[in-house]
Amino acid sequence: MSIITDVLAREVLDSRGNPTVEVELYTEDGGFGRALVPSGASTGEHEAVELRDGDKDRFGGKGVLKAVGHVNNEIAKAVIGHDVTEQRLIDQTMIDLDGTPNKGKFGANAILGVSLAAARAAADEVGLPLYQYLGGPNAHVLPTPMMNVLNGGAHSTNTVDFQEFMIMPVGAKSVREAVRMGSETFHALQALLKSKGDITAVGDEGGFAPNLKDNEEAFELLVEAIKKAGYKPGDDIALAFDVAASEMYDAESKTYTTKWSNPDKKYTTEEWTDMIDGYINKYPIVSVEDPIDENDWEGWQTFTKKMGDKVQIVGDDLFVTNTDYLKKGIDMGVANSILIKLNQIGTLTETFEAIEMAKEAGYTAVVSHRSGETEDTTIADLVVATNAGQIKTGSMSRTDRIAKYNQLMRIEDQLGAQSLYKGRKSFYNVKAID
């Protein structure tokens, strides 16, 4: 038994230069844990509350001194004296103390910082790597990465409608090889853009946002880059994309629109599904995220019924890492995968519960970063601890993204012959892929 003796939070900066919460936690036997909390730009309507100060004279209102204050006062008083290894009890203590359904009193950014710092301190206390402390001796599966190399939608100034275009090294034999394949394809894509006279500046997640006209051109460019890097599209490297459909849905008319490429064009849910199906039939696509609006549950049913056997369908804004929404989706036969974002729900315990529920229902789980990241590498350890099998952590640039890939390679080296990279077999619940 090792008792928590001190908890300290401070305001630091994330990868966008915006304030975020950092927490340090200490135990009586010398255990130490530090965690930094990420932040999303496009957030789901039902996510846990990220508490900001609202003081326009500091960071344009984005300061987090209120959240920091809650950690250093109410939360610290509540968790000091607890056994640092009692993760569920620590998390539940904070949830009860907050007393709101969405962590609106203290902020998920305050609560999550303490939750993660406690786990790190406990791992330090017992002398184990974080992934092994959290996952035990069976933590051994290295994830197949989703690498966001091209951006559109709200993440860019071009006229591409879908928000993220990703490559997945499904044919790699190890995470180290997957990272190399991704890096080589990223640089091949950069060379192609330069040859076309297009911009090669990168966005928040390290991907390019060139002046492309539509989704079709983005998919074609990725296929060309994969070939240029010396790989076979589909066999070696497959494609994935995030539609971010809520950005293009009109609830009143129940229609979708190609908001950026052709805003006058309207689609019913069936027509929208057929449009996406056309891309999936034409290109080596294995995964699609948020293809339907987060509140259009009937639309999700329609999409899943048609597409569920041929592609991974990931719910992000739909599920917001929340077991209540995930259970509803499972009961309704909606999606077949969940995106896992720690700060959407706000504690490590609740994150584990969402992953467990997904697996029990035959859904895959994709552990994900946020657009506002830090040097914190917890998600790399989490994805191995849970044997989730897939990770979404940005492109092959920007240190805040690369830090996670580097940590995965370290973990793979530590595991040695015990490690397993599943690649294409990560999509175990999709008949047309596995």
Curated annotation (Swiss-Prot):
Task: Cite the binding residues for (2R)-2-phosphoglycerate.
Answer: Q163, K341, R370, S371, K392
Subcellular location, principal: cytoplasm
Listed Pfam families = Enolase_C, Enolase_N
Kindly identify the residues recorded as the active site: E205, K341
| Family annotation (PROSITE patterns) | ENOLASE
Q: Tell me the residue numbers annotated for binding Mg(2+).
A: D242, E289, D316
Q: In which pathway does it act?
A: Carbohydrate degradation; glycolysis; pyruvate from D-glyceraldehyde 3-phosphate: step 4/5
User: What GO molecular function terms would the record report?
Assistant: magnesium ion binding; phosphopyruvate hydratase activity
Give the record's GO biological process terms. glycolytic process
Q: Give the reaction(s) catalysed.
A: (2R)-2-phosphoglycerate = phosphoenolpyruvate + H2O
Its annotated compartments are: Cytoplasm; Secreted; Cell surface
* Cofactor info, note text: Binds a second Mg(2+) ion via substrate during catalysis.
The family database entries (InterPro entries) matched by this protein are listed as: Enolase, Enolase-like_C_sf, Enolase-like_N, Enolase_C, Enolase_CS, Enolase_N
Alphabetically ordered keywords of this record: Cytoplasm, Glycolysis, Lyase, Magnesium, Metal-binding, Secreted
Function per UniProt: Catalyzes the reversible conversion of 2-phosphoglycerate (2-PG) into phosphoenolpyruvate (PEP). It is essential for the degradation of carbohydrates via glycolysis.
Family indicated by similarity: Belongs to the enolase family.
Indicate what this protein is called per its UniProt record.
Enolase
Instruction: Name the lineage.
Output: Bacteria, Bacillati, Bacillota, Bacilli, Lactobacillales
Report which gene this protein is encoded by. Answer: eno
